[in-house]
Amino acid sequence: MRMQTKLIHGGISEDATTGAVSVPIYQTSTYRQDAIGCHKGYEYSRSGNPTRFALEELIADLEGGVKGFAFASGLAGIHAVFSLLQSGDHVLLGDDVYGGTFRLFNKVLVKNNLSCTIIDTSDLSQIKKAIKPNTKALYLETPSNPLLKITDLAQCAGVAKDHGLLTIVDNTFATPYYQNPLLLGADIVVHSGTKYLGGHSDVVAGLVTTNNEALAQEIAFFQNAIGGVLGPQDSWLLQRGIKTLALRMEAHQKNALCVAEFLEKHPKVEKVYYPGLPTHPQHELAKAQMRGFSGMLSFTLKNDSEATLFVESLKLFILGESLGGVESLVGIPALMTHACIPKVQREAAGIRDGLVRLSVGIEHEQDLLEDLEQAFAKIG
């Protein structure tokens, strides 16, 4: 089944009891049992809910996993995955990793005696050099947030397997429509379902899947034990969003390439980060590893001090957190999504105060270009 079809018919796409084409919202916290221990597959909605289960089956189907898991946020899912680790374990993280992931590790998981080394995961030699005897996991974002670095998943997964490490991939930017890390050797895939999968800025959710049965059993335990599960209403919204993912991603990518080409030629712009541009240093790798380049891009102005006025002058591009909705969003990562990362560390990774990140929506591309142009005019 091709991906466009699987997005609509994959997983559990209808209700077996009534034939309803849309999976019902099972708005219940508990379930009747015929006798002690005798139930119909569900006991309590933290442990399992039919609406959530349909979503979990869908993400597993889309990514090639054996089981999926839906959480109340992307970070809740990442927390559950990191709970697979033991006290004393060490993890490799990307130097421009999402700020929330960095904060989770640096402020919460360190209290469980977990440690990490921050490296450029797109550089295989840095990964090999950073592996320690107690290293247990390699955590990757590709494309990364916000510098859109591309990591060679097959090569990294091979190195990880040689050293007995788990390869965990945040596939939020690419989505299953453009990239399937499990098929390239990864062990676990995580998503912020809030972003492209939901696609309408109306739900906060996280998704996890794996193609390893033993890992699936462990993640299922932590999902239930920690309890950060997704409710039935949000599970239904996310399933509805996924049905149109193919159409939206094609539109996001078309507009993003148009915007990236416009910015690359603009005299006020110093550098554009978008893997769909032939000038991107890993453009060929992105073409080989992905089926498309998605709708995220970042760029730096020649004068960092003009970034705040520029983003505040935009009208169609909404100044705000998050990404992946049908509307275009703009932000300054150093002051917003990555503000929790120390300035020296941010700048060493290339996340300057003047770096602007765009989540390019599906509006008419000419309206977006005109909005950018009028904002450039405001900064003189």
Can you name each region flagged by the protein language model?
Residues 1-42, 49:
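N-terminal glycine-rich, Lys/His-bearing helix-loop that initiates the first secondary-structure elements
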Residues 3-21, 305-345:
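C-terminal core of ALDH-fold dehydrogenases
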Residues 25, 33-54, 58-61, 329-354:
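Glycine-rich phosphate/pyrophosphate-binding loop
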Residues 30-79, 83-84, 100-107:
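Conserved N-terminal alpha-helix of the aminotransferase class I/II PLP-enzyme fold
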Residues 69-268, 273:
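Conserved PLP-enzyme active-site core in the AAT-like
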Residues 115, 129, 133-136, 248, ...:
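PLP-dependent enzyme catalytic core of the Aspartate aminotransferase-like
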Residues 238-247, 294-302, 357-361:
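Short, well-ordered beta-strand elements within core beta-sheets of diverse protein domains
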Residues 257-321, 342-347, 380:
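Conserved small-domain helix->loop->beta segment predominantly found in fold-type I
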